[in-house]
Each structure stands twice: as structure tokens, then as C-alpha cells.
């Protein structure tokens, strides 16, 4: 059985259909004081798959704790969590005395609830093995690169004037693995910008030595939250003579005001996977995730 939650119900239902599993939605009622009442089906099979993306995570983590614990009491012996976007992976070290390091804390929390944890492109910087971040019995960190490369190939063939005038650009060093993979899959030129934080809100982006004049630039990243880095990068590309700047992202967190910030910076198209529901979703991850779940069912 696959259990989903309302805000991610469409993707969860599609995954259940792809796996041939019965689907049910976890009931979540919010009380006026902010507490949650979680309700599961009264009878559960031995193996239960939970599907929920963990953007805006704090309430969701508590609800998963309640749901997973209740599932065990109802007879489930193996619990699998499919979280296409996995929260709290970005902080893997303390930058000040007394600062909580969220990655291992949340990783151990999830490993204590679920036997298997499956995610897509977790934002791991200094942690090289996903199992070190989430020490569950079985973990899988899938890559959306193939699906994104296929989308980019189809889109450029249908919409761009030629293939030769497209350049892929990573906004910082952490994006290099994604932009390089997409460029190699599509036979495109790519580069990686250098990002420097000058303060809490000021970012300096230095573009690589690429000829952007009259070229279409596609900025590629794994996560966009505030959009500030991408906005600064887009402005720099347009100032150097780029014909247009589009954006391709795996996880569209898009905090309040992010889309407006990107538009004001001159960004044209914005494409994302459906790891987090958003109007920019155009790359479906169902098949990628279903194949991973089938390997452990």
C-alpha cells in the first residue's frame, strides 16, 4: 500500500498507479493551536510506502513521526519513505559555537522511523555518501539528471532556433555536477560561475570566460529558494550580452517573492521537476522513483 498526503496527492497517486499498489491518503487535521491529528487506514499490509515531499518541513516531520509510529502499531513491519525533496540536508557543519547541525540530526530521526528512505538529488555538500546523512537500513539518492536532460533535448528541438547558441551555466561551484551532466548529455557548452557572499544579503557572481553575446543561457541548479543567486547570475549574463536567460531546477522551493525576483532580473522560462508541486513543474519523476521502489519491494 502507498500512503500519500493532500499537498502531494497527485504525485503520490501516480506513483501508486505505476507500482500497482493500492492508494490511500493520510488524514491530517490541524487544531487551532497548531497541533496535528493524523489518521491512517485501520488495516495496513506488512509493507507500507509513504510518499511526501519535505518542503516546509517542520509540521510535516511531526506528522510523519505520528504516521510512522501508528503504522507500526497497525501491523506494518517495513516502512519506506519516498521524499523527492529531502529537507535539512544543506547544513552539514556548524559555522558558530552552539549551532545545530541539522543534516545528521534529521537524518537519524528519519532513519529511526523508516526502513528505507528514497530521495532525489539531496543537497549534500561535504557529505559524499547519502547513507552517512540518513543511516537507514536502505537508502537511495536518485538523480533527476536523465529526466532533465531528456526534457531539455525535446524543448530545445521544438523551441530554440538552433542548438549551437545554447550555453548551460551553473551559478556556483556546487552546481557543477548537475550542469556538467546535462551539458554532456546534450552536447552543449557549459560553464560554472563563482559565487561570493559579501554579507547577509549581498551576493557577487563572477561569470566564467564564455562568449554569451547573442546566446541563450540556461541556468541550472538543484535547489532555488529565495532566487537571489539566480537573479544576480541572470543579470550578469544579460549585461554580458546574452540573448535570453532561462532556468532549469530540480527542486522548486521558491520562497515568497522568488518568482518575481527572477522575472525582474530578466529570466524568461522557468522549468522544474515535480519533486515539489509548483506551476513551473514540467518534468515528471514518477518513472524514476517507481523503478527505485520496485527494486526494494
Model region roles, listed by residue range:
Residues 1-297:
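PRPP-associated nucleotide enzymes
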